[in-house]
C-alpha cells in the first residue's frame, strides 16, 4: 500500500523530467524559427518578413467577358439640339466636358441617361438644372438650362453620355473560401475618355473567342470574342486600379480550377516562369516566359517586366495581346503575379503586377 509520502516521492521526479523535456522542446522550436528567417513578435504571433503568408487560391487563366453599369453617367461630348432657334450647342465650354461624371441632377441621384431625362422633363419649364459632377476625382457643382429638342419633343442638356462598359479579359484567381475573384490586374477604362467608372452592378460570362488579331510592331493585337453569349459566371462588384473584382456564383465553374499556393513578391526572381491563358475561350494552357526584372518600389501594375519565349504563343498571337490582361504568372509552382500590359513596339514583351497587390484589394 502506498502512503501519501511515497506517492509524492514518485511524482516529483516525473514532473521534473517533464519540465526538462518541455524546455528542450520549446527551445528547439524557437531555434528552428530563428534559423528560418522568421521572428516572434512580442504579441506572440509569427511574422513572415513581409511575404504573403501561405495562402491557397484557385488558378485562373480563363478568358471572361464582363459588362457593368456605372455609378453616375459619363460625359462623352456635346450633342447639338434642334430647337426653335435651329441646331444649337446647349452646353457652354467648361460647364461639362468630356470625362466628367454626372452623379446628381436637382439633388436626385442619376445612373442612366433615362434618369436625367425623367428629371429634366418633370421639373418646371425654363428652370436651370442643378448638376453635381465629378471631374478628375473631385466633385463640383454647375447649372445648365435644358433646351427643348423639337426632334424628340423632350427637354435635354445637349450631351452625349453613357453608363455601360463591357469588354473581355483573363481571370487571375478565385478565393476558394469566399468565391471572390480577381481579373485583369488593372482597371477598366472607357476607351474614349480614359476614365475608370465605378461599378453599380455588373456580371461576368464565359467568353466565346472568334479569333485573334496578331500583335505587330506599333499596333497591339487582341482577342476577338462574343461577350454575352456565354454562361453567366458571377457578379462584378468593383473596378479598381489593381483589377476587377467580384463573386463567382457558378459552382461548376469553380470546381474546374486547380488550387495553387500564392508566392509573395520577394519569391520572384529573374528567370523562367509560366503564364496561363486561353486563346480559344475553352482550353487553358501554360506558356513559357522569362521574367526579365522586377520593380519593388510601388510601380502600380507594372511591377514585373516579362518576355514571351514560347513559340506556340508567339506563332498564334505574336506575343501578348489585349484580352490577356490578368493571365496568371506562375514561378516555381507558386502564383506570383498577372500580366497587365504589352509593349506596343514589341508584343513579345510586357508588364505584370505582383499578386500581393491584387490580393490587397
Regions found by a protein language model. Give the residues of each.
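Gram-positive cell-envelope targeting signals
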Residues: 1-57, 171, 354, 359-361
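A short glycine-leucine-enriched loop at secondary-structure breakpoints
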Residues: 87-101, 122-124, 319-323
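PDZ domains, with a preference for the canonical peptide-binding region formed by the helix
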Residues: 104-138, 257, 346-348, 353-357
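PDZ-domain C-terminal substructure recognizer with occasional recognition of PDZ-binding tails
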Residues: 64, 97, 117-157
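Conserved PDZ fold ligand-binding element
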Residues: 91-113, 329-332, 336-337, 341
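Short, flexible surface segments
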Residues: 71, 98-99, 125, 269, ...
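Serine endopeptidase catalytic core focused on the charge-relay Asp
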Residues: 148-318, 322, 331-332, 340, ...
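PDZ/PDZ-like groove recognition
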Residues: 65-95
Amino acid at each position: 500500500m502506498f502512503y501519501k509520502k511515497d506517492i509524492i516521492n514518485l511524482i516529483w521526479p516525473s514532473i521534473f523530467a517533464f519540465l526538462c523535456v518541455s524546455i528542450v522542446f520549446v527551445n528547439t522550436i524557437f531555434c528552428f524559427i530563428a534559423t528560418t528567417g522568421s521572428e516572434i513578435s512580442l504579441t506572440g504571433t509569427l511574422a513572415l518578413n513581409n511575404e504573403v503568408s501561405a495562402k491557397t487560391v484557385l488558378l485562373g487563366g480563363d478568358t471572361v467577358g464582363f459588362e457593368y453599369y456605372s455609378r453616375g453617367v459619363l460625359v462623352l461630348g456635346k450633342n447639338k439640339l434642334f430647337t426653335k432657334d435651329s441646331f444649337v450647342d446647349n452646353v457652354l465650354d467648361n460647364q461639362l466636358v468630356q470625362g466628367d461624371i454626372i452623379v446628381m441632377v436637382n439633388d436626385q441621384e442619376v445612373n442612366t441617361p433615362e434618369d436625367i431625362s425623367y428629371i429634366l422633363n418633370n421639373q418646371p419649364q425654363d428652370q436651370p438644372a442643378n448638376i453635381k459632377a465629378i471631374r478628375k476625382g473631385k466633385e463640383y457643382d454647375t447649372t445648365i438650362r435644358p433646351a427643348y429638342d423639337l426632334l424628340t419633343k423632350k427637354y435635354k442638356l445637349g450631351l452625349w453620355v453613357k453608363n455601360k462598359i463591357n469588354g473581355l479579359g483573363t481571370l487571375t484567381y478565385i478565393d476558394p473560401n469566399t468565391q471572390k475573384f480577381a481579373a485583369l490586374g488593372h482597371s477598366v477604362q472607357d476607351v474614349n475618355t480614359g476614365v475608370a467608372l465605378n461599378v453599380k452592378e455588373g456580371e461576368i460570362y464565359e467568353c466565346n473567342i472568334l479569333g485573334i488579331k496578331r500583335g505587330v510592331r506599333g499596333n497591339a493585337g487582341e482577342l476577338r470574342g462574343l461577350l454575352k453569349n456565354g454562361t453567366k459566371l458571377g457578379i462584378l462588384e468593383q473596378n479598381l486600379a489593381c483589377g476587377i473584382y467580384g463573386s463567382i456564383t457558378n459552382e461548376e465553374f469553380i470546381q474546374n480550377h486547380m488550387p495553387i499556393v500564392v508566392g509573395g513578391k520577394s519569391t520572384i526572381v529573374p528567370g523562367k516562369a509560366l503564364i496561363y491563358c486561353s486563346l480559344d475561350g475553352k482550353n487553358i494552357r501554360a506558356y513559357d516566359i522569362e521574367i526579365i526584372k522586377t520593380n519593388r518600389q510601388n510601380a502600380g501594375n507594372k511591377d514585373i517586366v516579362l518576355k514571351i519565349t514560347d513559340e506556340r504563343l508567339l506563332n498564334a498571337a505574336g506575343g501578348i495581346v489585349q484580352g490577356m490582361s490578368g493571365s496568371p504568372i506562375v514561378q516555381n509552382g507558386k502564383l506570383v503575379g498577372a500580366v497587365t500590359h504589352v509593349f506596343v513596339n514589341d508584343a513579345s514583351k510586357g508588364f505584370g503586377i505582383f499578386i500581393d497587390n491584387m490580393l490587397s484589394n
